[in-house]
């Protein structure tokens, strides 16, 4: 597996695991604040192991070939193109599976595992909803997009059709435009046949997250994954 920033549960034993994938050019450290944010939001999150994997360093074609942390190559700044890094995307999906398997090996029940991500990481997290070999607790996609749509439809696994999905997107996003977020949600609800899919938009929010979105995310997780402890 790739390296990761890990923040152990403050309440033992750990009962939950949240695996969160960062965006292009970032690292796991960039999203590690989410652990403290959720732990301070409600005590139910104190029994969570937080895992923030680091993407490998690789050249990104759309950035002039500059090496940077990236889960897969982005060849052009077009979120609907079929000209994508299929191999890199599928390799990163396998990494997600490894982190899920590792959490299960650590004693976390699959229904208490959450897979999420931001931007490039959200593309992987949402795709994991139709590719994982396990039925888990929830999926999170913040400012994400849908890559490899045809391939995902052809290889879709029907293990998480009712698993809760939280998908948030800023209406002022200038990196992954808001209409792409809407199209992504429609794709996963229709072609992906994900029946328990929550899509929320945030006025004035760009390509980032804000307290309104994070609070909605926390409430979503409390209701759908942590309900017996919240």
From Swiss-Prot:
Location in the cell: Cytoplasm; Nucleus
Active-site residues, as the UniProt record annotates them: 119, 173, 207
Family: Belongs to the AB hydrolase superfamily. AB hydrolase 2 family.
Principal cellular location given in the protein's record: cytoplasm
PANTHER family from the UniProt entry: LYSOPHOSPHOLIPASE-LIKE PROTEIN 1 (PTHR10655:SF17), LYSOPHOSPHOLIPASE-RELATED (PTHR10655)
InterPro entries: AB_hydrolase_fold, LYPA1-2/EST-like, PLipase/COase/thioEstase
This protein's record includes keyword Nucleotidyltransferase: no
Reactions catalysed according to its record: S-hexadecanoyl-L-cysteinyl-[protein] + H2O = L-cysteinyl-[protein] + hexadecanoate + H(+)
EC number: 3.1.2.-, 3.1.2.22
Entries under Gene3D superfamilies matching the protein: alpha/beta hydrolase
Domain of life of the organism encoding this protein: Eukaryota
Keywords, sorted A to Z: Cytoplasm, Fatty acid metabolism, Hydrolase, Lipid metabolism, Nucleus, Serine esterase
Protein name: Acyl-protein thioesterase 1
One GO term describing the cellular component: cytoplasm
Record function comment: Hydrolyzes fatty acids from S-acylated cysteine residues in proteins with a strong preference for palmitoylated G-alpha proteins over other acyl substrates. Mediates the deacylation of G-alpha proteins such as GPA1 in vivo, but has weak or no activity toward palmitoylated Ras proteins. Has weak lysophospholipase activity in vitro; however such activity may not exist in vivo.
Species whose genome carries this gene: Candida glabrata (strain ATCC 2001 / BCRC 20586 / JCM 3761 / NBRC 0622 / NRRL Y-65 / CBS 138)
Biological process (GO), any one: fatty acid metabolic process
GO molecular-function term, one example from the UniProt record: palmitoyl-(protein) hydrolase activity
Top class in the EC scheme: hydrolase
One Pfam family, short name: Abhydrolase_2
């Amino acid at each position: 597996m790739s390296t990761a920033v890990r923040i152990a549960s403050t309440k033992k034993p750990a009962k939950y695991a949240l695996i969160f994938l960062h965006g292009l050019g970032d690292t796991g450290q960039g999203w590690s604040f989410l652990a403290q944010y959720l732990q301070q939001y409600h005590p139910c999150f104190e029994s969570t192991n937080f895992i923030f994997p680091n993407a490998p360093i690789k050249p990104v074609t759309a950035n002039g070939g500059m090496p940077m942390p990236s889960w897969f190559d982005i060849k052009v700044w077009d979120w609907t193109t079929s000209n994508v890094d299929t191999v890199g995307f599928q390799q990163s999906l396998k990494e997600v599976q490894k982190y899920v398997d590792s959490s299960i090996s650590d004693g976390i029940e699959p229904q208490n595992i959450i897979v999420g991500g931001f931007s490039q990481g959200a593309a992987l997290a949402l795709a994991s909803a139709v590719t994982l070999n396990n039925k888990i607790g929830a999926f999170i996609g913040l400012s994400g997009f849908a890559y490899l749509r045809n391939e995902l439809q052809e290889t879709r696994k029907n293990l998480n059709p009712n698993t809760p999905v939280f998908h948030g997107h800023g209406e002022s996003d200038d990196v992954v435009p808001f209409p792409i977020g809407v199209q992504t949600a429609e794709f996963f609800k229709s072609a992906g046949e994900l029946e328990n899919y929550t899509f929320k938009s945030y006025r004035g929010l760009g390509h980032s997250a804000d307290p309104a979105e994070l609070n909605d995310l926390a409430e979503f997780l409390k209701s759908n994954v942590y309900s017996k402890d919240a």
